[in-house]
Amino acid sequence: MSAVEGDVADASSLNPQTLGFMCGLEIHQQLATGKLHSRQPGELHDVTIDTVPDEWPRVHRRLRIAKGESGKVDVAAKFEAKRNRSFIYIQSPNSGLIELDDQPPDPHDSEALDIALTISGMLDAHPVPLLQTMRKTVVDGSNTSGFQRTTLVATNGVLNTPTGAVGVDVICLEEDSARKLEAQSTANGEIVIWNLDRLGIPLVEIATAPDVQTPDHAKETALALGTLLRDTRRVRRGLGSIRQDLNVSIACGDRVEIKGCQDLSWIPRIIRLEMARQLHFFRLANELREEIKLPLLPDNRDNTDDIIEEEVRQTVRKLLDKEITDVGKAFDNCDSKMITSTIAKGGVMYAVRLPHLAGRLGTKMPDNEGAQLPRLGRELAGAAKLAGVAGIFHSDELPAYGITEEEVTNVRELLAISDTPSCGFALCCAPDWQAELALESVIERGRLAWHRIRQEVRNVVVKKGAPEDGTTTAMRPLPGGARMYPETDIANLPLAEEEWHRIRSNLPPTRKERQKALLETALGEDQIMQLLDKEIDELFLAGISGELAPGMPALPVKGWATIILDST
């Protein structure tokens, strides 16, 4: 078996170096300007689904899969097309025909472009000579057009951190998405309601190289990037104005993109738990392979033999077929209100066999720090939830949830696995089409148990506005190259050398430089920090130097500081 060491139950003890840890960050920062491709104001309205004004128009849309201009269909788009979802867009006062995709976009907002170039200069990046806007396929409904407009601005920068330099691969200028207000489940599929106030607000996206050395260095890198962005004094502040995505892998796993890392203090924990998850499923894959005498996975993904993996894939496809069985009659006298009410409304109870997975699906158990240990059953449930169902029942956690031992026995009989204790099963109670889609997703994910984890996008599990425990759930496959194609409604924009020289010659001072200027006054450290945090140090310096207004004398240092701090 594998020589990869590490205790999955003690994620903090995992050694990044011996596990072949790789990590990079993607930072998305809102800019304090108008919208990127319309001249609408970039403001957010403080509304919920319950407080949206009745006079705001609503538009109902459904997205359909289509090939991009490359002639290919993106893998994430293929997956999303299986979900029977429709979307309602609420038109806020700062959204118009462009946000509704009923009018071609305007050219880039000049101020947003200037900020993106300024950030590129601060990161010592190399600007591209021709700015070409691209369309990035987005099929979750958060963009009315089905794509996000993004423009590559610069490449090959560097961010200095106390632990070491981190390369910056790309800096892009792109549109933010709409804000989700509510998702409603119906018998015919999910209806998602979006607010268009945020759609089109400029974002600068900064993607680092995989130079992050440890989970703690990831937090340090995010903090350094956030500080640099705030040094521009031209970015938005507050909750949701900056988002950090983490790209994480270990040698025996593969690249996973984790979204929803709002709180920097959680970043190391989230990364360590992902390392533990990848290690767990690598070991499980080899355990399953050994049981049916299949070649084991090598410890490093770089040594993977594609021919062997295809042979394993074909073997497992035959082992876990997609035969779905109606087991509703096993629950004719069920005490579970959830099951009986769903069936009474026309729902079904379907099941699939899970050969060799009995006892390996797992039950909810905490690790040494209270986070849920990785388990296959949770991954299967996550796959099913992407089809829109509330979840599944699997054999390792039954009897429970109002399902009795007798009903479990009846299900095993209907599935013809009564004499096969190593065979598990999964149940789904939902409308017919949804139960089928959910269980097909369960089988697809179950087959992956024999393989190295797939590349995918995952989301931090959040409860009451904060991470539940640092664990994640699957969102969608990691997008492929077919996701991106040229935007034909926006002209290419050449970047003149003199414009780049102007940007480089007028970079804003860093926080340390501003602090140094304030230290030359008679202010105490506390007031200096307050002036910097409130971004009013320039106003303060203008006042004490007599440059606040023509003819105005220099103001007293401490008195002027107190006045402006108290009034902001």
Q: PLM ranges: what are they?
A:
Residues 565-568:
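Small-residue-rich helix-loop
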Residues 2-506, 525, 547-552:
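Basic, nucleic-acid-interacting segments
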Residues 496-499, 507-547:
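Long, charged low-complexity interaction segments
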Residues 534, 538, 546-563:
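Helix-loop elements that line ligand-binding/catalytic pockets
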